[in-house]
């Protein structure tokens, strides 16, 4: 018997963060990469997270994106957060296990001086990968995706 879709599909949670107003972009990046990320990575791996990435979007990149958007007729909303954290896992139990880890609570407390608590943004969904390492993947010989149907995949975790 196959595992339920809630155990097979890869979930992606993103949390977009804004830095504290008195922290420079460079100091924020230095803190994230020099202090926070290595400790967080070990903690997340210990608790079953399959992937953990941090995406940085400094003002210079946001400005460039705004210019690109304007050149294309402004079809997009250009988000203005400083960094987005991505977590990949198979089920919400994995997320809850990590979130309830006492070490995670310590990690979150250390964020206080750097990350604004006023407005963070979160999203959760599933991942369908179609190109990996420059190669087309998960497409059958019939040219159709090999993923289960939307009705199965869209059952909330």
Model-identified regions with their sequence ranges:
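Macromolecular interaction modules
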Residues: 1-157
């Amino acid at each position: 018997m196959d595992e339920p879709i809630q155990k097979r599909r890869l979930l992606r949670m993103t949390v977009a963060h804004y830095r504290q107003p008195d922290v420079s972009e460079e100091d924020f990046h230095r803190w994230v990469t020099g202090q926070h990320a290595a400790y967080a990575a070990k903690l997340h791996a210990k608790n079953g997270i399959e992937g953990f990435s941090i995406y940085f979007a400094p003002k210079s990149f946001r400005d460039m994106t705004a210019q690109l958007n304007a050149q294309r007729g402004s079809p997009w909303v250009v988000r203005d957060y400083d960094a987005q954290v991505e977590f990949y896992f198979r089920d919400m139990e994995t997320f809850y296990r990590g979130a309830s880890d006492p070490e995670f609570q310590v990690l979150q407390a250390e964020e206080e001086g750097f990350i604004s608590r006023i407005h963070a943004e979160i999203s959760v969904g599933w991942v369908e990968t179609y190109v990996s390492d420059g190669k087309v993947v998960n497409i059958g010989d019939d040219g159709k995706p090999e993923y289960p149907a939307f009705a199965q995949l869209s059952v909330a975790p």
